[in-house]
């Protein structure tokens, strides 16, 4: 199979993975309107082509939280990553490390902090939810700090799990889910051998280490359902600051006022994100929400963005809309499921090449030169026409 883009990895992953795993990462909440708009809105952002600019000394390098990145991309936290490839978190982290970008380990990873951190040279980032079990949160923070994690990514848009209808149809949840998953695995022998058998243990490593006992997929679903905390508030972040003195990034903001609150709190960064369309369907796409947030807090706090990014051109678009760096989620999971570490490494190379083409043809020699001036404006509007707020007629 010829791999020339992230979409090729998606097609390959769909053939390789049991349906319950493919649709778990591929799907979104409810009717998946926001999931689709994340990609569609970003694809409509028109770049301003510039020529004869002598682009021979182009550089993608950037600095974030006193770390040098080879390009403004980090791998996002993704739960169950180790179910998509044998010890998947270790493989993905190795690819990111070799590329010179951060890898973010999820709270609900298969491989625990202590397994992943020693395998890479670059300090990894760690993602944490607000959970009812504050003892687990404190334990996770202490372990992340002991393992040398440099940055905490604190996810705030999940006080309760989103309703993902596709999961019930695919076997991730719903009637007879365990039996359905078993037969799907049997029908996908490559995955069953490489991951199902040889990728064990299939614990949620960070949780197992705290509870002192193995936790399987059913435990994952049950534990999360019982532990997400709808009482989350800024006081919880103040509590976390007692145990974490490194950079803290608040993930899951879509409103400028929430971004201003993050600045007032003293966060080091925010992630403009709708959780990849997996939480509340019908909210703004990240691309549509980003410009107003950038107008409100650009320069006061680091702005990261995710949701809908599929290639290097999308990275440039997000930066032009106001992001400093992006997080890559689904795209790297498809590559990981297809070819492990080599797949993720190749995807990152493709993104780098696509970014260089986009920057060369928009006249931006450095990441700092990508801005709103890189976008095509219409009638003097401050937003690209495709992302301007909908009128009442459009909304109807």
Curated annotation (Swiss-Prot):
Name used for this protein in its record: L-lactate dehydrogenase
Keyword Transmembrane helix: no
Predominant location category: membrane
Topological relation to the membrane, as annotated: Peripheral membrane protein
Cofactor(s) the protein needs: FMN
Family: Belongs to the FMN-dependent alpha-hydroxy acid dehydrogenase family.
Domain FMN hydroxy acid dehydrogenase: 1-380
Lineage, opening ranks: Bacteria, Pseudomonadati, Pseudomonadota, Gammaproteobacteria, Enterobacterales
GO CC terms: plasma membrane
């Amino acid at each position: 199979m010829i791999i020339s883009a992230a979409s090729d990895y998606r097609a390959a992953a769909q053939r390789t993975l049991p349906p319950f795993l493919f649709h778990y990462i591929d799907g979104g909440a409810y009717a998946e309107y926001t999931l689709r708009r994340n990609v569609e809105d970003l694809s409509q952002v028109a770049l301003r082509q510039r020529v004869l600019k002598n682009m021979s000394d182009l550089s993608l390098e950037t600095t974030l939280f006193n770390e040098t990145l080879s390009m403004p991309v980090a791998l996002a936290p993704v739960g169950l990553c180790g179910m998509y490839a044998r010890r998947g978190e270790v493989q993905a982290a190795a690819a990111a490390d070799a590329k010179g970008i951060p890898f973010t380990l999820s709270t609900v990873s298969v491989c625990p902090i202590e397994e992943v951190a020693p395998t890479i040279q670059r300090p990894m980032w760690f993602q944490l939810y607000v959970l009812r079990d504050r003892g687990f949160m404190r334990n996770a923070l202490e372990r992340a700090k002991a393992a040398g994690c440099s940055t905490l990514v604190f996810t705030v848009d999940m006080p309760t799990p989103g309703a993902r209808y596709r999961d019930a149809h695919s076997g991730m949840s719903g009637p007879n889910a365990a039996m359905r998953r078993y037969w799907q695995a049997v029908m996908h022998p490559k995955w069953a051998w490489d991951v199902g058998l040889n990728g064990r243990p299939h614990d949620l490593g960070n949780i197992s280490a705290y509870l002192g006992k193995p936790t399987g997929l059913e435990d994952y679903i049950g534990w999360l359902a019982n532990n997400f905390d709808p009482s989350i508030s800024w006081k919880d972040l103040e509590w976390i600051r007692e145990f974490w003195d490194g950079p803290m990034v608040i993930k899951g903001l879509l409103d400028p006022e929430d971004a201003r609150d993050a600045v007032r709190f003293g966060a080091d960064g925010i992630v403009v994100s709708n959780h990849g369309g997996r939480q509340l369907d019908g909210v703004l796409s990240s691309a549509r929400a980003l410009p107003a947030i950038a107008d409100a807090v650009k320069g006061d706090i680091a702005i990261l963005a995710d949701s809908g990014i599929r290639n290097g051109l999308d990275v440039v678009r997000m930066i032009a809309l106001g992001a400093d760096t992006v997080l890559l989620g689904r795209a790297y999971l498809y590559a990981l499921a297809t070819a492990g570490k080599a797949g993720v490494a190749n995807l990152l190379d493709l993104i780098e090449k696509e970014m260089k083409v986009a920057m060369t043809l928009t006249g931006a020699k450095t990441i700092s030169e990508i801005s709103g001036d890189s976008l095509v404006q219409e009638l003097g509007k401050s937003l690209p026409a495709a992302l301007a707020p909908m009128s009442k007629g459009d909304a109807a």
